[in-house]
Amino acid sequence: MSVIKKDQTREQYDRSKIQGGILRACYKRPIPVEKIESLMDSIEGDIFDTADKEISSTRIGEIVMEHLKDLDAVAYVRFASVYR
């Protein structure tokens, strides 16, 4: 799957980029690693369910924020402040 970036360039989907953003947002929060892994799996499932061959980085960010909002308010705000 390809990700369409804001400058319209394309690159291969990379789970580690999303995971890095989530880990930074959850830094020093009382969230077990298992919960973060489960969150990643859910996010990835949504990404692959909503897109065929391409998805915009903006849409990926929206999906991540939807999931983080339910997990932890502080992590959500951290991610949103960097993402926007």
Stretches found by the model and what they are:
Residues 1-78:
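Extended interfacial segments that mediate partner engagement and assembly in macromolecular machines
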Residues 81:
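C-terminal binding/interaction regions
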